[in-house]
């Protein structure tokens, strides 16, 4: 995958602000030292790839070894208070009461019409404390939504975390790398979706066994004053390479994961977005969350469209490509790329309910030409979460 293709993938998320107004993460100078090509993304100057590494090579390195990703542009929050669980359950469809301490779940903030304001990871630290990570591009509307609804809950406090970087380390050799770096902690007891506070050079860091590549790995919330030291120490291990936004996008697409603003948005419900699994069993019965009327109805009756995967012949499909069956437009591609792992053109998008079954033949229009395609299961590649 070349740089121009990567930039087209990232264009919908990129900031239009002048470079002088773009924010920088604590690792910005390290990116330059490592030979990064910097692009605007969600209001930040971010690395898209690094000198001497094609995006495809970076992708394959992460699948085979360990890749370091700067995700400090994402927003970190704490929600605290005796009504914290009730507050968060009022604005998400997740069953947070049942979530164990230092366990997490993928969730979504929903709006009054059942659409997704943003997708998010919610981690419970105790009955009154939650750590949340949201998308940088949704920062303003997330904050407005969180503050709007918190007024209904006495004693709940919202903190937007400042002064901390967020670093993801992903790939099959990651656990060994991290264990070598911090030998006094047994990371084998930390399973996928779990988190723990870990000391690194005298400071408290939050290690979450999670990520957005389909591989085993960690996301580390770390004070910015030691973040460069932490990242540099990891990169000193020959098994670790810095990986940019280009490969991050192809990795998450192979893993069948959504990119907010492309694959899901304010109009997409969790049900039609094939995210019904984030809706807790108890919540399906009780409802009571914003947008539950539409969402519960779609659970019962089915949505009009569904997010599915496609294999496309000959050329890669891109965001906005029309999906046709028997000459009728029945859907649209939301993400697509050549898969470095499979050597095939993969895509995800929406297709009318009834045509969403695996094996359904279709055609996808790319540059005004129709190309054969087929509905397939996601993820496109096997995932390797540590469970």
UniProtKB/Swiss-Prot annotation:
Catalyzed chemical reaction(s): N(6)-[(R)-S(8)-aminomethyldihydrolipoyl]-L-lysyl-[protein] + (6S)-5,6,7,8-tetrahydrofolate = N(6)-[(R)-dihydrolipoyl]-L-lysyl-[protein] + (6R)-5,10-methylene-5,6,7,8-tetrahydrofolate + NH4(+)
GO molecular function: aminomethyltransferase activity; transaminase activity
Signal sequence segment: none
Chief place of localization: mitochondrion
EC number: 2.1.2.10
Quaternary state and interactors: The glycine cleavage system is composed of four proteins: P, T, L and H.
Protein purpose: The glycine cleavage system catalyzes the degradation of glycine.
Cross-referenced PANTHER family: AMINOMETHYLTRANSFERASE (PTHR43757), AMINOMETHYLTRANSFERASE, MITOCHONDRIAL (PTHR43757:SF2)
Protein name: Probable aminomethyltransferase, mitochondrial
Highest classification ranks of the organism: Eukaryota, Fungi, Dikarya, Ascomycota, Taphrinomycotina
